[in-house]
Amino acid sequence: MNDSEFHRLADALWLTIEERLDSWDGDSDIDCEINGGVLTLSFENGSKIIINRQEPLHQVWLATKQGGYHFDLKGDEWVCDRSGETFWDLLEQAATQQAGEKVSFR
């Protein structure tokens, strides 16, 4: 994968997160902000989830209250380089915990 392909895929990931939060009808308010390639989800309790791209490594990084995760593209799925869990699974787990209610991005 070259840098432009990586950015296209990361942009698509950011857009999907935004669209799914816009259509989410939960009780909690989750704000989504993109600034300089960093996507920040802010929760009512003041906690945050930070998602950013690491261009030199062609990775997506996820920072949550539970810890930090690094994802490589495997086929059409972003997969954690340590646990093998998917980006969507770990994002949903973290968002659900930080929102205090089930959050789904699928």
UniProtKB/Swiss-Prot annotation:
Family: Belongs to the frataxin family.
Any Gene Ontology CC annotation: cytosol
Xref: SMART domains: Frataxin_Cyay (SM01219)
Protein name stated in the entry: Iron-sulfur cluster assembly protein CyaY
Domain of life: Bacteria
Keyword Iron: yes
SUPFAM superfamilies, sorted: Frataxin/Nqo15-like (SSF55387)
Signal peptide stretch: none
Gene Ontology molecular function, alphabetical: ferric iron binding; ferrous iron binding
The species this protein was found in: Salmonella typhimurium (strain LT2 / SGSC1412 / ATCC 700720)
InterPro entries: CyaY, Frataxin/CyaY, Frataxin/CyaY_sf, Frataxin_CS
Entry function: Involved in iron-sulfur (Fe-S) cluster assembly. May act as a regulator of Fe-S biogenesis.
Record-level GO BP terms: iron-sulfur cluster assembly
Keyword list, A-Z: Iron, Metal-binding
Coiled coil: none
Pfam families: Frataxin_Cyay (PF01491)
Phylogenetic placement of the source organism: Bacteria, Pseudomonadati, Pseudomonadota, Gammaproteobacteria, Enterobacterales
